[in-house]
């Protein structure tokens, strides 16, 4: 026990100890005991020490006491429970960094305490009596006092200070620009005022006891620290960092205290004392003890905590600046390096990441780095490294590690490559990623570091393109010392440049010998290169700055080859298995780890391309003003990079992604890499589905069906592995890639359409020929021997059907392909041609549901015009004649074939508009033999132009297939889509078609309209876009009872004694040209009476509108209304669909469906019945197909069960024959005999 206050001999004993050799240590112990006693009895400690003792001790103890004062609360609660049994009004202790800033404000401005801490007037008077010195043992440590003082300081000296908050998290997706309405931020300050009651100065025994425990623990810490080496020097240095000489005013900003300075005073070797020492006890209570391990834990919190206050955005952005100061590097322990990685991720930790471009990203709370992610887990070895026992007893350990963090690139700019270096529609550029400087590397080599391993490369991209621009790039980190792109490619990712920025954390794991790097430092500087592949962008000039990069490289230096604590990339699959269940941080991609990218819901199709290696023995192109550019060596081997859709579940080894495209640098002992051979995709064997032999005659006529390919039947016959998997799952779970195994034959002139019939509407008749209008109304893919890239295409189920087909039964889907000759042969082949059509499974696994998004949904928008894929009829130019071809923009008009009317999906979309303005995007294909050539100019104007006027207009000159973008230019600024007036596409022959003497074939070409970039003010819709006329019925005076039944499909009505008129409108055209449709509508009936022959006084009658489900005899009814015949109108809602949701365009014999029945017993009194359909928002369309053959509207057709004048009450009319979705009457294919049954 300590002596009571005022005990005799207290001061004399302290003076004697002060003069002895160990006096200072004893004096420290004595002074702390005095502080504890004075705190417990609430008496000033100055009355218990002499002035010279106070002066000697004051500066030595001040900061040491402050450092550990507030980290003792961890053990206070145990003490509380033992002595008091629990108390509810326990004051909340402040953290060390908050209390440290608080104490400095009080120490600086003691006179403001009386104004702020009103409840602590006695404490203020006591502190003022101490000659202006703020004594920590009297000052409360609760958060209440800390908050009061900090609020005063901020309001007095930092009025501009604003705490950074996460108010932007209230926005669901803050990527689409500023919100229209102002959003009140949900701000929550970091300084939250405590609601707990502050401890009173007197009367609360537990508060007094808690304060004593704090001082007692502090006394024990001071006694231990005083025995360490350099204790006095550390305190002197620490004191000079914060105060001027003979001054109590802090030199630094009070709210910018940095505990790293305080940390230097405690980076001393500490001796562990495992024994427990009793420092204080209360009367009648067990003694309070503190173990050495508790104190070490307390010091660990001090050393690992770096208190900072976030003031503004600039302060947050400055967190990266300290990385540049580490260019030379410093020796970091493993936990410290992990902390560096964590700090780098704090900027993006709370951001919202949805789906990566080709892989699913992690939620923010899972997106963290741990020791097991980057380093080998070895707790014993890590403990020895942290305690430095390895170096102390064995000198420099063979497994020691030095880690540096280098800001290698901060001003690098990636530019759009020159046109001269473009290849197959792509432009590849190279940018060197800087490495550590020569002097820094030389010092490391002199210090004994042998190897340098590049562990992590953090690449940040800042786009210079407009927001939401549909622009993508492929960035890959390459090893600069290999001419084989297969070996040089380390890691890479697709990047969407329309969202402003992107970050990629990659693991190159490139290890190099430091001595060799010094010998050939120029080669070392080019060891890591960023290669960027851009697709061709129209309108972007060569050398345009596309984005800037900043790269941060984490390098591990090793003294021996045995050293290293990072994960070795022995097996990507093993690393994936080790991290999948815990954090799933290894994602799908091109050896990409943690790809971070915003706004990845933008859909895009990045085609395959050849990736070139870094050129050898020449400077990497970094600017585009230099004229002397050395050519790329012909012996460089490129790699074919393919799409990554099928690899969403995991990482992709490099050798699965592509193969060399040429083999000039191949080993002569390797068969797979010999010159002249192409290495196949080794995963294609697993993706095989079926093959079918196709026979093409030597000469064919336009419209001839060369072959029909029933996809399910072929897969069922082949019984491949994928088909067995489809049977297990019950549906086709992937898209199909169709490959035509044709040779490169540009002079053969063979071309054909692949017609995609998802519902099997054409397949039921097994046609041998189709007319041109019917072919162009279906989705098509053009295959021509003049372009080998057309030999492959992907059959996307969601695009062409709207859902995945069932594996075994056709049901309402029978996906069938027809190979149809697009033009008549003008240059006959010497013999028939036989080739195989192969199907492979590609892409990610598809869900067994509808497509995630429909192809179109109401209300109609201008953006729906961007994706049309409309083929125009082939154009033929005669040899030796210079002709001009005019193509009007009347793409919404229907096409007639005999007595039938045909629509395409693109025409149905355009039918919603009167006219459009903007930019037209198209492609022209050469479908004939390249033995016949011509030069053409393509432009657009309101009428045919002279060649001189055409030259100054926007135009495209071409002699082969080319894509073009033409702005719509017309006197009305817009063009009619129905052909009344407007702009035209003009194709002028700059050179008439020419060929060798023996070749008399004409020049054939086909235009494809990809879509329009609409100019919103110039896209004028028709007057009605939500309400359309459906049909009209005109009874006669001989008509009896009228009974009309409306089914939940876009059907038509037929009658033998009533004239039925089906109206043409954009909505029904969309229903006809989509595989499925689904949504809610409102049916509007209106009718009129005969004006001349019907007497209104005696007419009478009632109209009944009933709703029901299934056969009528089961009386499963809904609402029923009886209306007077004089009311003239009625409205009833209806949902178009089936039990499965969407309504397909195929006959389904479903009895149990919703229906609406319109009946009246006196049909002769009604002159006409008009029915309109109002489409409600959300009505959706799925898939694309061609419309059925529709007869001319307004004629009378044979009777069916859809409309009847009989009084039959039977249920036969419920048999489902309404799924034809026809707009008129008169089925039949014209060229084929006999009427065609209802579709399906």
Swiss-Prot record:
Q: Which GO terms describe its cellular component?
A: host cell plasmodesma; viral capsid
Q: Is the Metal-binding keyword given for this protein?
A: no
What species is given as this protein's source?
Cycas necrotic stunt virus
Q: Where is the signal peptide?
A: none
Question: Highest lineage ranks of the organism?
Answer: Viruses, Riboviria, Orthornavirae, Pisuviricota, Pisoniviricetes
Molecular functions (GO terms): structural molecule activity
* Pfam families xref list: Nepo_coat, Nepo_coat_C, Nepo_coat_N
Renumbered residue ranges of the record's region Disordered: 1193-1240
Official protein name in the record: RNA2 polyprotein
Similarity annotation: Belongs to the nepoviruses RNA2 polyprotein family.
Keywords, in A-Z order: Capsid protein, Host cell junction, Transport, Viral movement protein, Virion
Q: Tell me the superkingdom of the source.
A: Viruses
Q: How is it modified after translation?
A: Specific enzymatic cleavages in vivo by the P1 encoded 3C-like protease yield mature proteins.
């Amino acid at each position: 026990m300590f002596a009571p206050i005022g005990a005799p001999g207290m001061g004399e004993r302290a003076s004697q100890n002060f003069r002895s050799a160990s006096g200072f240590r004893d004096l420290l112990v004595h002074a702390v005991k005095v502080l504890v006693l004075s705190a417990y009895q609430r008496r000033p400690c100055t009355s218990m020490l002499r002035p010279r003792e106070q002066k000697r001790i004051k500066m030595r103890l001040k900061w040491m006491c402050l450092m550990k004062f507030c980290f003792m609360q961890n053990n206070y609660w145990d003490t509380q429970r033992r002595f008091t049994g629990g108390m509810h009004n326990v004051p909340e202790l402040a953290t060390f960094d908050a209390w440290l800033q608080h104490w400095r404000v009080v120490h600086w401005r003691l006179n403001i305490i009386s104004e702020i801490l009103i409840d602590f007037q006695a404490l203020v008077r006591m502190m003022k009596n101490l000659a202006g010195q703020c004594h920590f043992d009297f000052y409360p440590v609760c958060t209440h006092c800390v908050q009061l003082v900090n609020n005063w300081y901020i309001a007095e000296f930092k009025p501009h200070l604003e705490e950074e908050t996460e108010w932007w998290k209230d926005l669901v997706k803050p990527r689409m620009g500023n919100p229209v309405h102002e959003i009140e931020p949900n701000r929550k300050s970091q300084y939250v005022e405590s609601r707990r009651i502050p401890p009173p100065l007197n009367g609360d025994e537990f508060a007094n006891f808690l304060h004593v425990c704090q001082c007692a623990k502090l006394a024990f810490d001071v006694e231990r620290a005083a025995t360490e080496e350099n204790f006095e020097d550390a305190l002197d240095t620490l004191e000079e960092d914060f105060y001027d000489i003979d001054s109590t005013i802090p030199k630094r900003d009070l709210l910018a205290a940095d505990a790293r300075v305080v940390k230097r005073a405690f980076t001393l070797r500490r001796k562990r004392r495992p024994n427990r020492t009793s420092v204080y006890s209360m009367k009648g209570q067990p003694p309070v003890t503190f173990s050495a391990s508790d104190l070490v834990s307390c010091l660990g919190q001090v050393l690992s905590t770096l208190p900072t206050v976030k003031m503004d955005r600039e302060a947050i952005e400055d967190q990266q600046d300290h990385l540049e100061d580490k260019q030379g590097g410093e020796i970091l322990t493993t936990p410290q390096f992990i902390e560096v990685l964590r700090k780098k991720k704090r900027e993006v930790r709370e951001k919202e990441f949805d789906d990566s471009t080709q892989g699913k990203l992690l939620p923010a709370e899972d997106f963290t780095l741990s020791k097991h992610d980057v380093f080998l887990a070895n707790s014993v070895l890590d403990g020895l490294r942290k305690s430095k026992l390895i170096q102390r007893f064995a000198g420099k350990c063979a497994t020691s590690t030095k880690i540096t963090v280098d800001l290698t690139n901060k001003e690098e700019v990636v530019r759009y490559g020159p046109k001269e270096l473009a290849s197959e529609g792509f432009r590849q550029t190279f940018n060197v990623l800087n490495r550590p400087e020569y002097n820094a590397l030389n010092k490391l080599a002199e210090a004994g570091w042998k190897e340098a391993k590049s562990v992590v490369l953090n690449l940040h991209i800042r786009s210079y393109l407009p927001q939401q621009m549909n622009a993508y790039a492929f960035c890959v980190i390459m090893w600069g010392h290999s001419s084989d792109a297969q070996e040089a490619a380390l890691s890479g990712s697709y990047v969407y440049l329309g969202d402003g920025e992107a970050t990629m954390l990659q693991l190159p794991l490139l290890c190099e010998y430091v001595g060799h790097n010094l010998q050939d430092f120029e080669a070392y500087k080019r060891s890591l290169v960023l290669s960027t592949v851009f697709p061709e962008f129209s309108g972007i000039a060569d050398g345009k700055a596309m984005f800037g990069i900043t790269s941060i490289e984490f390098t591990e230096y090793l003294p021996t080859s045995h050293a290293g604590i990072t994960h070795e990339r022995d097996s990507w699959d093993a690393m994936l298995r080790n991290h999948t269940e815990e954090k799933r941080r290894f994602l799908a991609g091109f050896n990409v780890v943690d790809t971070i990218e915003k706004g990845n819901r933008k859909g895009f199709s990045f085609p395959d391309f050849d990736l070139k290696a870094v050129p050898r023995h020449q400077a990497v192109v970094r600017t585009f003003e230099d004229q002397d550019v050395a050519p790329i060596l012909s012996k460089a081997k490129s790699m074919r990079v393919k799409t990554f859709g099928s690899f969403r579940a995991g990482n992709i080894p490099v050798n699965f992604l592509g193969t060399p495209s040429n083999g000039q640098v191949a080993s002569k002992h390797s068969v797979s890499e010999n010159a002249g051979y192409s290495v196949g995709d080794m995963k294609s064997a697993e993706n095989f589905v079926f093959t079918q032999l196709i026979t093409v005659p030597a000469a064919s006529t336009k419209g001839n069906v060369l072959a029909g390919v029933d996809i399910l039947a072929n897969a069922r016959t082949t019984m491949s592995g994928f088909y067995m998997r489809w049977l297990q799952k019950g549906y086709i779970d992937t898209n199909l890639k169709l490959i035509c195994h044709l040779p490169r034959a540009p002079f053969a002139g063979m071309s054909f359409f692949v017609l995609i019939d998802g519902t099997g509407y054409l397949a039921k008749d097994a046609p041998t020929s189709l007319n041109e209008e019917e072919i162009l109304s279906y989705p098509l893919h053009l295959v021509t021997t003049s372009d080998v890239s057309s030999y492959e295409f992907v059959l996307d189920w969601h695009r062409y059907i709207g859902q995945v087909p069932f594996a075994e039964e056709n049901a309402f889907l029978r996906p069938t392909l027809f190979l149809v000759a697009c033009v008549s042969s003008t240059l006959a082949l010497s013999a028939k041609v036989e080739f195989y059509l192969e199907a492979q499974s590609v892409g990610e696994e598809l869900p067994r549901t509808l497509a995630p998004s429909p192809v179109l949904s109401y209300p109609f928008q201008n953006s729906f015009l961007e994706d049309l894929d409309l083929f125009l009829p082939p154009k033929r130019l005669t040899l030796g004649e210079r002709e001009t071809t005019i193509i009007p923009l009347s793409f919404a008009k229907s096409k007639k074939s005999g007595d039938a009317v045909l629509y395409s999906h693109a025409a149905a979309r355009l039918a919603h508009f009167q006219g459009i303005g903007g930019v037209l995007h198209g492609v022209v294909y050469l479908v004939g033999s390249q033995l016949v050539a011509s030069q053409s100019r393509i432009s657009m104007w309101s009428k045919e132009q002279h060649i001189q006027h055409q030259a100054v207009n926007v135009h495209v000159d071409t002699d082969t297939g080319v894509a073009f973008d033409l702005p719509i230019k017309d006197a009305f600024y817009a063009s009619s889509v129905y052909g009344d007036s407007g702009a035209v596409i003009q194709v002028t022959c700059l050179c008439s078609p020419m060929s060798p003497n023996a070749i008399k074939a004409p020049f054939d070409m086909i235009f494809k309209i990809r879509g329009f970039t609409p100019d919103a003010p110039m896209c004028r819709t028709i007057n009605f876009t939500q309400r359309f006329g459906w049909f009209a019925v005109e009874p006669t005076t001989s008509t009896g009872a009228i009974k009309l039944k409306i089914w939940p499909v876009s059907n038509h009505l037929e009658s033998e004694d009533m004239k039925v008129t089906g109206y043409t409108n954009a909505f029904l055209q969309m229903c006809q040209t989509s595989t499925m449709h689904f949504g809610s509508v409102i049916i509007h009936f209106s009718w009129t009476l005969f004006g001349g022959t019907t007497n209104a006084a005696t007419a009478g009658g009632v109209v009944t509108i009933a709703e029901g489900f299934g056969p009528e005899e089961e009386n499963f009814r809904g609402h029923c209304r009886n209306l007077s015949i004089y009311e003239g109108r009625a409205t009833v809602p209806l949902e178009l669909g089936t039990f499965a949701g969407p309504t397909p365009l195929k006959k389904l014999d479903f009895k149990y469906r919703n229906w609406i029945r319109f009946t009246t017993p006196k049909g002769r009194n009604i002159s006409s019945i008009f029915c309109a359909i109002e489409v409600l928002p959300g009505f959706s369309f799925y898939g694309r197909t061609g419309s059925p053959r529709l007869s001319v509207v307004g004629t009378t057709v044979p009777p069916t069960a859809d409309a009847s004048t009989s009084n039959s009450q039977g249920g036969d009319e419920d048999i489902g024959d309404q799924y034809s979705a026809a707009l008129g009457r008169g089925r039949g294919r014209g060229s084929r005999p006999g009427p065609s049954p209802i579709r399906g």
